[in-house]
């Protein structure tokens, strides 16, 4: 299951959960004291927010894969694209 991953640092988790829940028309798949994430299907994105950073904004981007074989395939595609 390949997904693009986006992680954003926010200052106010509750306010941000409310905003993104309205934006995505979905509740988070997981919520912790300092973290929430949505596993969206259209587009296929693992979208996460947390208060675990220095300042609000983009924390990191990535790809989510199920196993080492998918990771190797993705690595090969990235190397071929370069």
Regions found by a protein language model. Name each.
Residues 13, 63-82:
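Vicinal oxygen chelate
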Residues 3, 57-60:
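Eukaryotic phosphotyrosine signaling hubs
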Residues 53-55:
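Short, flexible turn/loop "capping" segments at secondary-structure junctions
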Residues 37-41, 59, 82:
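Short, surface-exposed, charged/polar-biased interaction segments
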Residues 1-2, 7-46:
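Core segments of cupin and vicinal oxygen chelate
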């Amino acid at each position: 299951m390949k997904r693009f991953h986006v992680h954003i640092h926010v200052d106010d988790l509750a306010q941000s959960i409310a905003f993104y829940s309205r934006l995505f028309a979905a509740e988070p798949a997981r919520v912790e004291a300092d973290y929430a994430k949505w596993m969206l299907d259209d587009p296929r994105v693992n979208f996460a927010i947390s208060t675990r950073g220095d300042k609000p904004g983009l924390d990191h981007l990535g790809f989510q894969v199920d196993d080492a074989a998918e990771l190797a395939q993705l690595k090969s595609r990235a190397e071929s694209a370069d």
